[in-house]
From Swiss-Prot:
This is Eukaryotic translation initiation factor 3 subunit H. PANTHER family: EUKARYOTIC TRANSLATION INITIATION FACTOR 3 -RELATED. Component of the eukaryotic translation initiation factor 3 (eIF-3) complex, which is involved in protein synthesis of a specialized repertoire of mRNAs and, together with other initiation factors, stimulates binding of mRNA and methionyl-tRNAi to the 40S ribosome. The eIF-3 complex specifically targets and initiates translation of a subset of mRNAs involved in cell proliferation. GO terms for biological process: formation of cytoplasmic translation initiation complex. It comes from Aspergillus niger (strain ATCC MYA-4892 / CBS 513.88 / FGSC A1513).
Amino acid sequence: MAEKEVPLTAVKVEALVVMKIIKHGSQAFPTTATGSIVGMDVDGTLEITNSFPFPVVEVPAESHFDNTAPNPAAAAPRAKANAAYEAEMVRMMREVNVDANNVGWYTSANMGNFINMNVIENQFFYQKEMNERTVALVHDVSRSAQGSLSLRAFRLSPKFMAAFKENKFTSEELQKSNLRYQDILVELPVEIHNSHLITSFIHQLQTPTQATPSDLPPSLAALESSQYAKSSVLAPNFDNLSLSIDPFLEKNCDLLLDSIEVHHTETNNFQYYQRSLAREQAKITAWQNKRKTENASRAALKQPLLPEDEWQRLFKLPQEPSRLDSMLNSRQVEQYARQVDSFVSATTGKMFAVKGNLLPGETAK
């Protein structure tokens, strides 16, 4: 194992592990799939060489339609039963001479909605109990289905680890520690690694070549009607002018609006707390002023003074709600916004190109 003083800079994942994670996530979709990853830390690079899924807990059929039902798969990495199962699997791997150092866990996601309390608690459990240098691999099944593999590695920042350990997420504590929602997760670059045998085999594969015509066409008409002329790379591709919006983009926009509504609700709750606190503080101030006036009168009459700290028993200040949920939701809004930004570039250009035809009275400039 590498020295702890060397910070983690990258994550190298074997291609076989990536395929196992993709298969597990696709089979469990749309529910969450979780599992453990093993490997070793080499000079600041976390090499992940194997993985195995956590046991599946059967869920009653009626709970699939209950939004408030708990998700046992999402909480599986920190379950006591799975911790014993993970230790037994690691022991068996060591018996067959496989890299069996626990380096983290993986989870599947849908539309990038992986920033939630389950992921935070799981990663906190691994970094605190298992190994401080563990990571969480997040595989987005929906994004990967679009043709581009989405596999990212995250760790909790030391600043957030300290705040989560003490469970101090009040406004005062956040201002003191300067903790922002951008500081919750630290992303590490992911590199997919193949063995030398697989790399050599891929380089030996021959690219199929198209057959060339053996005889020249007898006329220009025959040349224009041949399959080689029709398949020319210079032929215009009108599919690029399609104005259909990607369903993935539409769903991301819906999720973004939902997260913004949740953020608005959290803001209203905090403002209600501030108004309640201001009312109670005004009552306390009025009571203290009245008590001081009474004590001044009693002092003039040489009577015993009344206690001025009695307000602590008479009044109860409202407790400030935790800002953790608001921070996680803000980080999720940022995640959705980045995904939307990556998908709108092509569609936005097309919409501006036909703006003059879509809106009457305007001409495209």
